[in-house]
Regions:
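Bacterial N-terminal signal peptides
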Residues: 11-24
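Flexible, small-residue-rich N-terminal segments that precede or flank a structured functional core
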Residues: 28-79, 160, 164, 209-213, ...
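Beta-strand-rich interaction/scaffold domains
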Residues: 35, 98-192
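Ser/Thr/Pro-rich, low-complexity mucin-like regions
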Residues: 183-227, 237
Length: 312
């Protein structure tokens, strides 16, 4: 009898890939990521870009012009497919406020719904660095997600088309300091992006009070030499659930899962590794109130059978 579990993307399942072998014990892990790309959208100069600057701008300036910032993180490169996201924090650092006065406001992170490119432009005018420089092909601008090829639905992006209608998280932002976003919405976003990397277009950072002047802020970008002021995504996750022990006893196959408190576990089987055949529940351990190993058993047969462990 051959037993296989193979890695599978976009699920919270782990498939065992061994012949009566041992796999790694599931545990909670944490990783901190810096952006893989970030950029500023500049209403006053809608065809300019600023992807190479050491800051991001968001909010309404004293002159009534809006800036919005974009940032994305390569989650799939840092977290194993099939992991369960349990907590998310996003940290941003305000590095500058308006010179002539400032107003505190609620800032939000909204999931971006279409691809965009960072670009590498630096300010063209040192006297007005926030205006960026004429966009190069592919740069994110106020009018384009990718200059010359992919326009926003409306300049600055349209809610519910270019970016989510509701925010994933929000926090009040005032003076020069570090600020944190957290909450269930961010967990949902990151889980989605881990399970479906092609949908990971990151977040838009914007004030929710775009009619209030002096809410503009500069935030550290990924280009800063001091990464301590760059945006950070802190991910706490459970690696894919695995079957930690497989052995034969009393003419039965025994498959053990290390179960964590507060999650439901099951072991399932079917006759083929791929395809659309339904999985049959071998043992449903239900919600775990006392953590520790749980073992499912299955009679030995002459036919191949495939098993997976599932955590909800």
């Amino acid at each position: 009898m051959t037993v296989f579990f193979l890695p599978r993307r976009a699920t919270h399942f782990a498939w065992l890939g061994c012949f009566l072998g041992l796999l790694t014990l599931a545990r909670a892990d944490q990783v901190t990521l810096f952006p893989s790309a970030d950029a500023t959208l500049i209403e006053l100069k809608p065809t300019n870009s600023l992807g190479g600057a050491t800051w991001l701008a968001a909010g309404l300036t004293q002159n009534g012009n809006t800036n919005r910032a974009l940032m994305k993180f390569d989650i799939a490169a840092a977290v194993s497919a099939g992991s369960t996201i349990v907590d998310i924090g996003v940290r941003v650092s305000v590095t500058r406020t308006p010179v002539d006065g400032n107003a505190d406001s609620l800032f939000s992170l909204r999931r971006v719904l279409r691809p965009w490119n960072e670009g590498s432009n630096l300010p063209a005018d040192s006297q007005y660095p926030g205006l960026g420089a004429p966009a190069q092909l592919g740069d994110a601008t106020w009018t384009h997600a990718s200059w010359g090829t992919n326009a926003w639905t409306i300049p600055g992006g349209q809610e519910d088309v270019d970016y989510a209608a509701g925010f994933s998280a929000s926090t009040g932002i005032g003076g020069i300091a570090d600020y944190f976003f957290e909450g269930a919405g961010l967990i949902t976003d990151v889980q989605l992006w881990l399970d479906h990397p092609a949908q990971n277009f990151g977040w838009m950072l914007k004030t929710e009070e775009e009619k209030s002047i002096f809410t503009a802020r500069r935030f550290g970008s990924r280009e800063l030499e001091d990464a301590g002021e760059s945006p950070q995504l802190i991910i706490t996750y459970l690696p894919p659930v695995v079957i930690t022990n497989v052995h034969i006893a009393s003419n039965r196959l025994h498959l053990t899962v290390d179960a964590l408190l507060g999650y439901s576990y099951a072991v399932e089987s079917r006759a083929t590794a791929a395809g659309t055949n339904a999985w049959t529940t071998l043992t449903n351990f239900g919600l775990i109130f006392s953590p520790g190993p749980r073992t499912a058993t299955d009679p030995l047969t002459n036919s191949a059978r495939f098993y997976r462990a599932r955590r909800n």
